[in-house]
Amino acid sequence: GYKLADVYNQKITMDEFIAQLSDEDLMILFRGEGMCSPKVTPGTGSAFGGLTESLRAFGIPAACTTDGPSGLRLDCGTKAFSLPNGTALGCTFNLELVEKLYEMTGLELRKNRVDALLGPGLNIHRSPLNGRNFEYISEDPLLTGKMGAAQIIGLGIAGSTGTIKHFSTNNQEAHRHEVEAVVSVRALREIYFRGYEISVKEGQARSVMTTYGPMNGLWTSGNYDLNTIVLRKDWGFEGIVMSDWWAKANTEGEPSDMKNHAAMVMAQNDLFMVTSDASDQTQDNLVEALADGRITRGQLQRNARNILGFILKSPAMLYEMDMISEEELEDRKGDTEEDAAIDDIIYYESDEKGDVYIPGKDWDTQMGATIVFGINVESAEYDIEITARSPLGELSQLPITLYCDNVFKEMISFRGSQGEWFTDKREFGTLLGPSCHYIKIYFGATGLEIDNITLRYRKRVPGFDD
């Protein structure tokens, strides 16, 4: 069959390429995976595109996104620049400076193989109680739009892009999944849409994120007028629209439902973010909606065209076609040893009991060594068991430091065991899921041998998909 590179090289049209894809392939393309998918850069927000062997066989790469409005969020411990927040940028009134700053951020995205930043945030400052106002630029739609466009232009100079969010009227955090914004058309056009319109028309934004909540009766991820009429027909937008993470949608007159992905497909919200497994057809209503005619294959193909069109212009496609410059490849080789280890990270899955077993016999545990690994877990409280030994005497002190998602967890000081194996068990805490988390262990002394580490499932807690 044809490869996506054949579209890039203009040997075939995008429609000819998409015609090869099965209904199942099209549904999988609609679903992103995350957070921290092992199929893309460790510690990032989502993966989308070529997430299965079937899609990879068509030459579709997995593209990557990560937060956010204050710089790259890399939860595995990779260092990144912290940027001034959106309000601070707005206070400069300096478009040239902001554009240059985001050109540098675009280079950082390229270095970390991230295709789209999940920002800028363009919601209007409406209430001082909004806990995320710092991410947003101002109460002025013109300033907001101009600053958003400058960020997108800067990212584009470096060959990257951003995702303007949250479209639209996400102006408070309390009860944001349910609170309804009731707004007149004039207020929407003049205030709440204006920043997005400027960023699309002047900044050539290629990625938009919808909100969690409803606007005038419809949850925005399933709002056809918002995602198709206003965004694409009125403004000429040609990129992708994605949901916020684990967002709901509804059909007019019905309650919202996290499984109602058919409403998103119909509205041209191209990507649902996120799932733990994009190939799982039981997690939403797409199969039954296609069978009973609520959605059509043509609508799935339309969404796929948007997604693949975005990927064609992304760094992921350049890597897929081996078209990355020698300079960029050399720059990636300049990472620290710790960053290089993160690139080669190993992921461990939970078993049927919810436990995660991590073998440690091959680890380098010399003083100053660092081990990083990923774990895929459900939302639960966990204990941690460390089975180890040391040839040293009982008076020896052997400290290790545990980090989870780059946040300090605990320092444990073991004693020498004269070669005898022992198991240390203690509370580890709550891990939210379904998601991947990153564990880092720093060894503060030489002389400790690790046999294994086991995270023991204790009890379930509400997770991202509840």
What are these regions (language model features)?
Residues K440-L448:
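Short beta-strand-plus-loop segments that form exposed binding edges in beta-rich domains
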Residues N112, I386-P391, G444:
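Solvent-exposed strand-to-loop "edge" motifs in beta-rich extracellular domains
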Residues R389-L398, G447-L448:
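Extended, low-complexity, turn-rich repeat/linker tracts enriched in Gly/Pro/Ser/Thr and Asp/Glu
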Residues G1-T370, G374-D383, P399-W421, G429-L431, ...:
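Glycoside hydrolase catalytic-domain context in secreted enzymes
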Residues I450-L455:
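Edge beta-strands of extracellular beta-sandwich domains
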